[in-house]
Each structure stands twice: as structure tokens, then as C-alpha cells.
Amino acid sequence: MKVELHSHTMRYSGCAVSTPAQLMTALVKQKYDAVYLTEHDAVWDDWELDNLRRDFPGLRIFPGVELTLPHDDHLLVLGTNDREYLTLRHPELILAKARQAKHLTVLAHPFRWPKAHSLLETGPLPDALESRTHNSDAHAGEQSQAVARQHHLPLVNAGDTHAADTLGHFWIDTYADLVTGGEIYDIVTNGMYENAMKKRK
């Protein structure tokens, strides 16, 4: 399955420029099979997700969130819209809750700015690191790869998509179907996927 792990819409992310419908339309056009909605410090309610799924029945739409941590690093929590995550301030509590529930945690764009990888220095560690995204260049990807080797963490490509017209540069292809959003935990932690990127012309 072609999967977008990291996406934003105008509904809940002020930095995004596409509506949910615009983003879903672009995902379908580019033959994505699944997407995680990871708004900044906000989650979609179940009824909102259900409405979006009805409008785009060929796309598997899953919840998630991008949390801003105290040192300004960002953590994706995938497969959940549990609002308790929005109230937790300490990374230790967030990661403990996620691990117990098997919600995949991914340190987003860890080398996009100086403090974006603070969690790797203070611990505890997330389940995975982002490697390449639309907003992280090849050098940042190389830095992520080096740190992932050091800590024995999986790497995932993601769009970090804020606009429909920037979609389709980086994603993962999974070896197994995602039926529920939570299944991404086992897929990534067991290496049942490949990182993919748009081929240069």
C-alpha cells in the first residue's frame, strides 16, 4: 500500500493551505491507498473522519497527531485521535502511553532545525525517525540515517504535506494491507515496508 504518514489540512493546521477535500482528491489522483491526518496539536473527531471517509471511499483515512514537545521537536503519534495526548506535556508520558497502546511514534523532521532532534539527546526514544520529507533535504535525510543506525531505529519517508500540490515526493510502501490505523505500529517496527520517493526526470 502507498501510504502518507504525515499530512496537514487547513481545518486544524494554520500552516496548511489545502482543505481536507483538496488533499484527499490529490491523494486519490496520485494513487495513494492510505493517509494519516497529523494536524499540529489537534485531532480529528470520529464523526469528522467518518464524513471524510464517506466522501472518499477508495482511500483509507486514519487519525494521528503531530505534537510539539517542550524543546520544539515534533512527534507524530499515529493511529489514534485520543485527546489525552494533547494534554500531556512530558515526552516520557507521551511515549509511555503510546507504547502501551501500540500507537506508532515518529520523530518528525529531526534535522530541519537545530532543536528538532532534542528528544534523541534526552530520551526516551521514539519508535522511528523520519528520513526524507518534502521539507527535509538530502543532507537532513543523511543525518537521520546516521542517528537511526546509532540508535537502531527504523526510518520512514513521509510527505509532511501542507499543500496538495506538494504531495507525492516521499512516502512508504507497505507489504501488508492497513485495515485499521493502529496496524502501522507492527508494520514499521517489524520492517514490513519500503521507503519510496518520486523518481527524478
At which residue positions do the language-model features occur?
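Surface-exposed amphipathic alpha-helices with a cationic face
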Residues: 2, 28, 50-54, 90-106, ...
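Charged catalytic cores and adjacent phosphate/nucleic-acid-binding surfaces used
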Residues: 1-5, 9, 13, 21-25, ...
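Short acidic, glycine/proline-enriched helix-loop-strand junctions
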Residues: 44-62, 151-156
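Divalent metal-dependent hydrolysis catalytic cores, especially in the metallo-beta-lactamase
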Residues: 4, 8, 25-44, 104-106
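Short, well-ordered coil/turn segments that N-cap beta-strands
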Residues: 1, 31-34, 57-61, 101-104, ...
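Metal-dependent catalytic neighborhoods of phosphoester/phosphodiester hydrolases
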Residues: 13-18, 44-55, 119, 168-169
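Divalent metal-binding pocket/active-site signature
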Residues: 17, 42-43, 71, 81-119
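A short, structured active-site edge motif that brings together acidic residues
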Residues: 62-69
